[in-house]
Amino acid sequence: RDAQESRGLGDVYKRQYLDFAAGIAVFALGYNNQAYNQALKDQIDKVIHTSNLYYNVPMMEAAEKLVKATGLSKVFFTNSGTEAIEGAIKVARKYAYLKDGSNDHEIIAMNHSFHGRSLGALSVTGNTHYQDPFKPLIGGIKFADFNDLESVKAQITDKTCAIIMETVQGEGGIYPAEPEFLQGVRK
């Protein structure tokens, strides 16, 4: 059934439901969000989508806002979270290679994580339920326990090029990272 007033969904029996999950692995805009709908209507007669080989004004404006809000200097737009994970894996490994031509390719990921359904994303997903049907996965991935800095440190070697994690794990519940854990991993 149609959604009404951004608050939730209705079924064929006219019962209303509030969605406290906000979708699975997506950003939450609500349902039938009028501001979002109007922005889409305004844009549809202009440019809907271009390859990331080309820039467009909305993309540049969004990049500028992201840079200003985060203090970071680069933005990489993708079509999905899975594609973002694939890009992150490739950037980490390419950076390590270009830095000194080394084989520093190991990535540390967290147990009980979920990063997507592509082969690369499954490789850094810390859940064998998702991984097993698609093995062998890409190599060089190690797993540590979320919110356990010593577990992460135990996995770091001279071949480590990246650590990948969700700041809030949503697999099997809602588990936010402790600030001290994030600060320790960042060091």
Residue ranges and their predicted role:
Residues T157, Y175-K187:
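Catalytic PLP-binding core of fold-type I/II PLP enzymes
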Residues T160-I174:
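Short acidic, glycine-rich surface-loop motifs adjacent to enzyme active sites
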Residues D2-Y13:
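Single conserved hydrophobic/aromatic residue that forms the stacking wall/gate
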Residues K65-A162:
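PLP-dependent aspartate aminotransferase-fold enzymes
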Residues Q16-S102, E106:
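Glycine-rich loop-to-alpha-helix module at the N-terminal edge of alpha/beta enzyme cores
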Residues R15-Q16, I174:
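Residue-level signal for well-ordered, solvent-exposed loop/turn and beta-edge residues enriched
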Residues Y17-A21, A154, R186:
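Beta-strand scaffold of nucleotide-dependent catalytic cores
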